[in-house]
Amino acid sequence: MPAFYGGKLTTFEDDEKESEYGYVRKVSGPVVVADGMAGAAMYELVRVGHDNLIGEIIRLEGDSATIQVYEETAGLTVNDPVLRTHKPLSVELGPGILGNIFDGIQRPLKTIARISGDVYIPRGVSVPALDKDCLWEFQPNKFVEGDTITGGDLYATVFENTLMNHLVALPPDAMGKITYIAPAGQYSLKDTVIELEFQGIKKSYTMLQSWPVRTPRPVASKLAADTPLLTGQRVLDALFPSVLGGTCAIPGAFGCGKTVISQALSKYSNSDAVVYVGCGERGNEMAEVLMDFPQLTMTLPDGREESVMKRTTLVANTSNMPVAAREASIYTGITIAEYFRDMGYNVSMMADSTSRWAEALREISGRLAEMPADSGYPAYLAARLASFYERAGKVKCLGGPERNGSVTIVGAVSPPGGDFSDPVTSATLSIVQVFWGLDKKLAQRKHFPSVNWLISYSKYSTALESFYEKFDPDFINIRTKAREVLQREDDLNEIVQLVGKDALAEGDKITLETAKLLREDYLAQNAFTPYDKFCPFYKSVWMMRNIIHFYNLANQAVERAAGMDGQKITYTLIKHRLGDLFYRLVSQKFEDPAEGEDTLVEKFKKLYDDLNAGFRALEDETR
């Protein structure tokens, strides 16, 4: 019999034929072996036991199937029924996804909490992922009856919220001649909005479509990415940029700030939509996201303030939820991201953390008695990671009108003890193009974001050169000089520890002081202040320009004075005479972007000119 919760929550109806059933032979944690499953397919969705627990077939041998169950298996016994559904694990895609929170297999947590009245998810619960009764404002495009339409064509617009319009596309595998298209009005997800005829067969479609999570959604072609992912974090935007459609990894030990960087990207990046997957991380981190995001606002180009939650979907699969569902949560998240990409949007997907996903793979692999590889992880770990990260990219979308979309994947990795030679980290680094390596020592010094500028890298710098040339022709040279200064500081630190600062040449003292400026007042950023939580790219460029300009002018002044008979210019003299300008360099980060771009650029230009005037006056004095 179906189970009832509060008189409303019912599980799968069990009036199917007996031939659709197998029976449980063995239970080992989340892994169940069932017999009598002849004809079943790999990755087919099944319902296990009298509670109808959701499971997925991961191995077939003869008529026995090995199933990973996405819910707690306590209470399952031998000979319990296993019902086949004849479909793979799929997600529902349609209006209502944004602003929602799902678990790893796309069950809506708010709805379950409201209906069951419990803080925990009842076992075997079956609730539609999207509300089928909610009415949506449907506005058809230029298609009329008699037109030919193919998979991926956008045939209507649905008003999802004040931030985003939901563009309704025909499922990728559909095509035909339109025999009916719904007029403008309000419709639910159960209502037919378009009917097609192909080779004499009529098919009707609603605004809802279903897609198997392990199958990438088809695209017309892949494109080279050339637009930066602006995160609002200076160290990432200026030194190690990613692109819209890129792949990034954030490895770091516990307490280094991976989650804060992931959340900052969700809040402030220039993406149109964000899918945040909490995969096996602490439950209170997801709770923090749920409390913070609805209160956070973003300012649109027309000056409107909108809630960040309106462009965000959360997939919560915390560490106390069943292990097997962690694997599903990553695929659920990327499929939702691909759905919005197909509308022509730029989507970011945060996976926090892929290490927990790999640990779930390791546990299931151990239960299946597979041969372990490095650190007990399965031999196919790298292949699974690659197949996930390869679903990122900038694409030309299927169907018309012609449009481009992108999925950017940012995966946090938690290597034990911060050891980057860990199998998950090394497999991830062989795939991703951007590496934002977090450093425990920087985090202990309270330098956040604790991205180590000596080990991090980005392979997208060349792809973004044309963008930088248009934005600011000087930026590439300034950035190269800043990197040289930071690298030179690292080389000089050993000498300083041996002989002290005073024994250094004047040029080296200037290098050390400039590197300190870059480290403490440029790369470090306070995520909890209104002026520094988000740094627009123009502010990042101007701050770096002024610091490097100070470095160049100071070096030139010292070199010129060295070849003359007058008073020698030393670093101590520069700092003493130009202390006010030095203080203004340090204070650049306190300029609030809320004042507007023109006001801030004016202030930065004035500082640039004042630096020129200050050094000119100093050289005149010492002649």
Swiss-Prot record:
Classification via InterPro entries: ATP-synt_VA_C, ATP-synth_a_Xtn, ATP_synth_asu-like_sf, ATPase_a/bsu_AS, ATPase_F1/V1/A1_a/bsu_N, ATPase_F1/V1/A1_a/bsu_N_sf, ATPase_F1/V1/A1_a/bsu_nucl-bd, ATPase_F1/V1_b/a_C
Gene3D superfamilies in the record: 2.40.30.20, 2.40.50.100, Bovine Mitochondrial F1-atpase, Atp Synthase Beta Chain, Chain D, domain 3, P-loop containing nucleotide triphosphate hydrolases
UniProt KW keywords: ATP-binding, Hydrogen ion transport, Ion transport, Membrane, Nucleotide-binding, Translocase, Transport, Vacuole
GO biological process, one term: Golgi organization
GO molecular function: ATP binding; ATP hydrolysis activity; protease binding; proton-transporting ATPase activity, rotational mechanism
Top-rank taxon: Eukaryota
Residues binding ATP, per UniProt: 252-259
The keyword ATP-binding appears for this protein: yes
Function text: Catalytic subunit of the peripheral V1 complex of vacuolar ATPase. V-ATPase vacuolar ATPase is responsible for acidifying a variety of intracellular compartments in eukaryotic cells.
HAMAP family in the record: ATP_synth_A_arch
UniProt-recorded name of the protein: V-type proton ATPase catalytic subunit A
Organism field: Arabidopsis thaliana
